Amino acid sequence: MIIPVRCFTCGKVIGNKWDAYLDLLQLDYTEGDALDALNLVRYCCRRMLMTHVDLIEKLLNYNTLEKSDNS
């Protein structure tokens, strides 16, 4: 879905780091090196970025307001 704005455990703002994290991964940084470059040292904040699954683009393909032809 959408990256949470704050870490669930400690409350640190992490939502603004998602795009930078993806950019660093595109530059062939490892996950750990990218998180270190973003100054995310707490393991709770690190897991928020590492385990996030970005599904928003896939969900936007489904329009729940459209009626199907089968009804």
UniProtKB/Swiss-Prot annotation:
Spans through the membrane: none
Keyword vocabulary terms for this entry: DNA-directed RNA polymerase, Metal-binding, Nucleus, Transcription, Zinc
Domain of life: Eukaryota
GO biological process per UniProt: DNA-templated transcription
Protein task: DNA-dependent RNA polymerase catalyzes the transcription of DNA into RNA using the four ribonucleoside triphosphates as substrates. Common component of RNA polymerases I, II and III which synthesize ribosomal RNA precursors, mRNA precursors and many functional non-coding RNAs, and a small RNAs, such as 5S rRNA and tRNAs, respectively. Pol II is the central component of the basal RNA polymerase II transcription machinery. Pols are composed of mobile elements that move relative to each other. In Pol II, RBP10 is part of the core element with the central large cleft.
Family indicated by similarity: Belongs to the archaeal Rpo10/eukaryotic RPB10 RNA polymerase subunit family.
Protein name: DNA-directed RNA polymerases I, II, and III subunit RPABC5
Organism, scientific name: Brassica napus (Rape)
